[in-house]
Amino acid sequence: MEFAAENEGKSGGGLHSVAEGVRLSPEPGREGVRDLAGAEEFGGGEEGTGLTGIKEIGDGEEGSGQRPEEIPMDLTVVKQEIIDWPGTEGRLAGQWVEQEVEDRPEVKDENAGVLEVKQETDSSLVVKEAKVGEPEVKEEKVKEEVMDWSEVKEEKDNLEIKQEEKFVGQCIKEELMHGECVKEEKDFLKKEIVDDTKVKEEPPINHPVGCKRKLAMSRCETCGTEEAKYRCPRCMRYSCSLPCVKKHKAELTCNGVRDKTAYISIQQFTEMNLLSDYRFLEDVARTADHISRDAFLKRPISNKYMYFMKNRARRQGINLKLLPNGFTKRKENSTFFDKKKQQFCWHVKLQFPQSQAEYIEKRVPDDKTINEILKPYIDPEKSDPVIRQRLKAYIRSQTGVQILMKIEYMQQNLVRYYELDPYKSLLDNLRNKVIIEYPTLHVVLKGSNNDMKVLHQVKSESTKNVGNEN
């Protein structure tokens, strides 16, 4: 833009110098040289065009001896160019003043100088033709430079918009800026984001009872390789599978039952703990109410009742022995005699050595067979699914099971067992035997190598030895 303005100033200055240096000599038949003021008088006071003054000069030239045929042709050309000059000047002034006058006031002064040159010039056709031709060249240069300047502004705006989009989207693109190429940094940003999103693995921490923690954020505390899926309600250890659950129960001797009376500090006491305590009190009240309604457990057992139990057992051929109060078996025993049905309801303990399981059956009538007693445990169809899973060694066995009962009042080093008939009733199997508090039945697999020696096997071995000696 500055270069265009300098060229324009030079061209305007040249016109002014040419106009000042030209001094037209008087021609024959004319009174003298008329300057621009005289042209205004001949033109009737019109400013800007001077068309009337030129016409009067042409009339004066008719008497001067010039060719009358050439002058009208030149006047028509001059008229058209002079008529077009104000419009061209207005367009140039409008564009220049709107875009560049505020920043560069010198251009406005040069336009004013051109107007003065136009007014001070003589009526010479050659000078006027040179003046009128000059502004057309200036107009084209100004238009071209103005267009270039607007394109530069649009390119700058586009670059600013691209940079804003680049920062907003957090994506760096390859762009040519000052002849240098900016490399893409997408991969670098992605690596940083991935590093930030990684979760650091922390060693397992034993949280107190009642503490909540998401299972997805912990590992199995038994194997330490898989993701935790279960949590033991008692010891709060995390496990991933059934083998890990069994392993942790065997190692820690945990029964998997939540301890409802475990200590919880005030800081860790939550609404869930309050609800658990409330339900525990409800269970205690329900148990107390159940005992109060039970006719047989309503009163404490007196010595008279103990003698009554022994006498009834003796009548059925059972030698029943009762322990003093305070012994564990005495507390556990729930055996009673039903006077209406005239039968015993026994407290029976069932032990499964091959599965290391132990169960208790209460109020078992003495007329019930042993097979009926074992059906809820080892029957493939009628047994409980949880118990069946634990006793699957007995269910899958094709050899069957043996029911044994320990012989009481034997020497300490001699442990022998009775083999019971599973098809007979409990009363028939207990006759002529000694029972301490309640019967304990050992269910073992046939043919398994164990240290349990049955009584009839001992008798057969003794008879063989006697025969060999004879």
Curated annotation (Swiss-Prot):
Q: Which PROSITE patterns match?
A: ZF_HIT
Q: Does the keyword Ubl conjugation apply?
A: yes
- Gene Ontology cellular-component terms listed: extracellular exosome; nucleus; pre-snoRNP complex
Q: Which GO molecular function terms does the record list?
A: ATPase binding; enzyme binding; identical protein binding; TFIID-class transcription factor complex binding; zinc ion binding
Which CDD domains did the record assign? zf-HIT_BCD1
Checking SUPFAM superfamilies in the record gives:
HIT/MYND zinc finger-like (SSF144232)
Keyword entries, A-Z: Isopeptide bond, Metal-binding, Phosphoprotein, Ribosome biogenesis, Ubl conjugation, Zinc, Zinc-finger
Q: Where does Zn(2+) 2 bind?
A: C232, C235, H248, C254
Q: What are the transmembrane regions?
A: none
For biological process, the GO terms are: box C/D snoRNP assembly; maturation of LSU-rRNA from tricistronic rRNA transcript (SSU-rRNA, 5.8S rRNA, LSU-rRNA); protein complex oligomerization; snoRNA localization
| Crosslink feature (Glycyl lysine isopeptide (Lys-Gly) (interchain with G-Cter in SUMO2)) location | K79, K108, K118, K138, K143, K153, K162, K173, K183, K200, K459
Task: Give the protein family.
Answer: Belongs to the BCD1 family.
Put simply, this protein is called Box C/D snoRNA protein 1
UniProt organism field: Homo sapiens (Human)
Encoding gene, per UniProt annotation: ZNHIT6
